[in-house]
Regions:
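Intrinsically disordered, low-complexity sequence elements enriched in Ser/Thr/Gly/Pro
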Residues: 15-16, 74, 132, 136
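Glycine-rich catalytic cores of cysteine/serine-nucleophile enzymes that process amide/ester linkages
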Residues: 3-65
Length: 140
């Protein structure tokens, strides 16, 4: 049952996150085994789940997915693929990071720096009604 629940979630387009060493990286799952995220290379990129886990040279163990998704959020993420420094400025781990990208995809608005004190999970609750996360079992 968990397997079918995760599959159902992944068919719905959703926010994903991973942890390693106390740090978190977030992105938008857009279907077809693809995640869009704002990378440390200052570029909005598409990658597969395995590459997402290895961002920054670390090897996180799990990807967590929100149990509610949105096609509008996925469209916003897709529209930014290829954007870089000219469109978004340089990547900054404190203020111009993957969380900011996800918040902007969720809200449809430019994220002001003072909003970054909140966790993207809070925005998932507000914009998607998502308050539950599951580990993505990529083996099934």
């Amino acid at each position: 049952m968990v397997c079918s629940l995760i599959l159902w979630i992944l068919l719905r387009l959703t926010v994903v996150r991973r942890y390693h060493g106390g740090l978190e990286h977030t992105g938008i799952y857009v279907g077809s085994n693809q995640i869009i995220h704002w990378s440390e290379n200052s570029k909005v990129e598409t990658c597969n789940p395995e590459a997402f886990l290895q961002m920054g040279g670390d090897l996180a163990l799990s990807i967590y997915v929100s149990c509610i998704g949105s096609s509008q959020v996925a469209l916003r993420a897709r529209a930014q693929v290829g954007h870089g420094i000219d469109e978004r400025g340089p990547y900054d781990p404190l203020v111009n990071n993957s969380h900011r990208f996800v918040i902007e995809c969720l809200s449809g608005q430019e994220c002001k720096e003072d909003l970054l004190v909140k966790d993207p999970i809070e925005y998932c609750k507000v914009y998607l009604g998502a308050d539950n996360w599951r580990v993505w079992d990529r083996g099934n």
